């Protein structure tokens, strides 16, 4: 890797332990499987804004696509309508089941699911190269070299540029309902997408980046309908019901024609590059 004025690799390593600590270290399949339903619901709320990310990607009907850490298929399913085929890879069987359900509901027939831990992926051995590789909000973002080795045409990586993230949007609805959930400090731009951008630059890559509006939205005919829908995201004990409703009320606005709207907006970056020999 080119020796730049700043050691971005060291900064990246220092920024990583907090994100990697926790139960995912011992059993990532169990951890991600347990939240498959929640992520599926959040993906539904994000559908309107997901289109902004899709519009930023260069994908043609001739391309094979690998979606790493696909979750419930938030990107995999709509990408399948743009591409020749999609391989949706995840560590949790429950996530892949949701992905398959969503693909079937959308009439998608060119999507294949693959159960595999990213740490066990060996490019060219147990996972073949694809034209396009997508890694969105996944631990795979920590290994740009491996991502580069899996793609023929483009690698696309996506993550948040500012607060609130998906976790923050979710958790805000359940503060006081689940005592383990606490507000997080706002994201620090000092350690944002600039880290991966500069890592790639120091490896001889000329990355592209586009920041798009992201968010979560749904309109409801009543507040009661909103409560009933959003409670799918997390268990609500009977004695915490009023706390939950007050949390939801903070995020609802009345619609002129009746009903209410839930909307939380944020931003996501889409970064991409043409794979090739890296300067390591």
What are these regions (language model features)?
Residues 68:
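Conserved beta-strand/loop positions that form the S-adenosyl-L-methionine
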Residues 72:
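Conserved SAM/SAH-binding loop
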Residues 139-151:
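A short, conserved alpha-helix within the catalytic core of class I
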Residues 1-58, 156-180:
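Conserved class I S-adenosyl-L-methionine
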Residues 208-280:
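Conserved Class I S-adenosyl-L-methionine
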Residues 189-204:
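Short alpha-helix
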Residues 75, 81-110, 114-120:
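Class I SAM-dependent methyltransferase SAM/SAH-binding core
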């Amino acid at each position: 890797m080119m020796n730049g004025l700043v050691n971005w690799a060291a900064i990246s390593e220092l920024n990583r332990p907090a994100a990697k600590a926790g139960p995912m270290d011992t059993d990532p399949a169990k951890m991600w499987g347990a939240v498959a339903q929640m992520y599926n619901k959040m993906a539904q709320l994000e559908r309107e804004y997901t289109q902004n990310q899709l519009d930023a990607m260069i994908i043609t009907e001739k391309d094979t696509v690998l979606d790493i850490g696909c979750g419930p298929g938030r990107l995999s399913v709509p990408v399948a309508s743009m591409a020749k085929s999609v391989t949706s890879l995840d560590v949790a069987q429950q996530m892949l089941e949701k992905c398959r359900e969503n693909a079937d509901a959308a009439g998608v027939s060119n999507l294949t699911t693959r159960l595999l831990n990213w740490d066990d992926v060996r490019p060219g051995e147990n996972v073949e190269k694809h034209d396009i590789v997508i890694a969105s909000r996944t631990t795979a973002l920590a290994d740009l070299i491996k991502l580069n080795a899996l793609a023929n045409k483009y690698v696309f990586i996506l993550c948040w540029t500012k607060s609130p993230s998906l976790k923050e949007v979710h958790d805000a609805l359940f503060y006081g309902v689940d005592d383990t959930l606490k507000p997080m400090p706002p994201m620090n731009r000092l350690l944002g997408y600039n880290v991966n951008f500069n890592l790639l630059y120091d490896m001889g890559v000329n990355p592209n980046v586009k920041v798009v509006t992201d968010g979560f939205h749904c309109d409801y005919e009543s507040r009661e309908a909103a409560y009933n829908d959003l409670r799918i995201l997390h268990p609500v004990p009977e004695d915490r019901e009023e706390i939950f409703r007050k949390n939801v009320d903070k995020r609802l606005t009345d619609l002129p024609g009746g009903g209410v709207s839930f909307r939380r907006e944020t931003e996501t970056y889409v970064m991409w590059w043409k794979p090739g020999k890296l300067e390591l």
